[in-house]
Swiss-Prot record:
Species: Streptomyces avermitilis (strain ATCC 31267 / DSM 46492 / JCM 5070 / NBRC 14893 / NCIMB 12804 / NRRL 8165 / MA-4680)
Gene: nagB
Catalytic residue list: 67 (proton acceptor), 136 (for ring-opening step), 138 (proton acceptor), 143 (for ring-opening step)
Family matches, as CDD domains: GlcN6P_deaminase
EC number: 3.5.99.6
Protein name: Glucosamine-6-phosphate deaminase
Known pathway: Amino-sugar metabolism; N-acetylneuraminate degradation; D-fructose 6-phosphate from N-acetylneuraminate: step 5/5
Alphabetical list of Gene3D superfamilies matching this protein: 3.40.50.1360
HAMAP family: GlcN6P_deamin
Length: 261
C-alpha cells in the first residue's frame, strides 16, 4: 500500500486525475470504477478539464458503478446512475453506452447482483477503482463487519445513512430507499489498481485504522492492505492521526516522477 499525503482536496484530485489520464494513454478503453459523493468531485473536475483541453482522450473509456439504490427508477435524479451521468459521463463526453452498473430496479435483486459481478469479469475487470471512505471505515456500502470476501450484494441502509442522505431528497427521509446494491469487498479487491481519496479531519481515525491498523472486518477499508496495488491519497487533515506520516512524506518525495502512483 502506498500512502500519498497532499496539501488539500484539490491537490489530491489533480494527482489522481493525472494517474487516470496516464492509464487512458496506455489503455484508451480502460474500465474506470467510480464512486459517488462529494469526495471524488475534485478528481472528476480535474480529469474533465484535461479532456476539455485536449490533453486526454477519454472517448473510449468505460465507466463502472460501485453501488446503486434498490427500487429507485434509473431516471430518478438521485439514482447513482443519474448522478454519475451528470458528474462523470457528460463532463468526459461519454454516453450511457460507456456505462455499466447493477440494475437496482430488478425484481430478482440477488440475480442482478450476481449478473453485475459476471459483467465486470466479462468486461475484463476494473482497471482503476476510485474509493471514498466513511468515518467508520466503510467502502462502498460495506459497513463494519462486512465479509472481506463479500461479493456484490444487497445491503440495508442504516437509519443514520438514510437521515444523512435525506438532503438529496428534499429533506424527506421517506423518499430515501432502504436498500442498496454494492460491490462487495471481494469484488472491489479484484480491480487492478485501487485508489482511495480521503480528506478532512473527520476521516483521520478511519485513515489511521485503514493504513496502520490490523486487517479486520471492523474496518472494511483495511482490506486494501491485502491488495498488490493500492494507493491511499489523503490531505494533511486526514493524515493527522498517522504515526508514520513523516515516513510516507519522505518516501513519496523521493519517488521518480515516471513511476506515478
Amino acid at each position: 500500500m502506498e500512502v500519498v499525503i497532499v496539501p488539500d482536496a484539490r491537490a489530491g484530485g489533480e494527482l489522481i486525475a493525472e494517474a487516470m489520464a496516464q492509464l487512458l494513454g496506455r489503455k484508451p478503453e480502460a474500465l474506470l470504477g467510480v464512486a459517488t459523493g462529494s469526495t471524488p468531485l475534485p478528481i472528476y473536475e480535474a480529469l474533465a478539464a484535461q479532456v476539455k483541453s485536449g490533453a486526454v482522450d477519454a472517448s473510449r473509456a468505460r465507466i463502472a458503478q460501485l453501488d446503486e439504490y434498490v427500487g429507485l427508477p434509473a431516471e430518478h435524479p438521485e439514482s447513482y446512475r443519474s448522478v454519475l451521468r451528470r458528474e462523470v459521463l457528460e463532463p468526459l463526453g461519454l454516453g450511457m453506452d460507456a456505462f455499466m452498473g447493477p440494475d437496482g430496479t430488478a425484481e430478482d435483486v440477488q440475480g442482478a447482483c450476481e449478473a453485475y459481478d459476471k459483467a465486470l469479469a466479462a468486461a475484463g475487470g476494473v482497471d482503476l477503482q476510485l474509493l471514498g471512505i466513511g468515518t467508520d471505515g466503510h467502502i462502498g456500502f460495506n459497513e463494519p463487519c462486512s465479509s472481506l470476501a463479500s461479493r456484490t450484494r444487497i445491503k440495508t441502509l442504516t437509519e443514520q445513512t438514510r437521515v444523512d442522505n435525506a438532503r438529496f431528497f428534499d429533506g424527506d427521509i421517506e423518499q430515501v430507499p432502504h436498500h442498496v446494491i454494492t460491490q462487495g469487498i471481494g469484488t472491489i479487491l479484484e480491480a487492478r489498481h485501487l485508489v482511495l481519496l480521503a480528506t478532512g479531519e473527520g476521516k483521520a481515525d478511519a485513515v489511521a485504522a485503514t493504513v496502520e491498523g490490523p486487517v479486520a472486518a471492523v474496518c472494511p477499508a483495511s482490506a486494501l492492505q491485502l491488495h498488490p496495488h493500492a494507493t491511499v491519497v489523503v490531505d494533511d487533515a486526514a493524515a493527522s492521526k498517522l504515526k508514520l506520516a513523516d515516513y510516507f512524506r519522505h518516501t513519496y518525495a523521493g519517488k521518480p516522477d515516471w513511476q506515478g502512483i
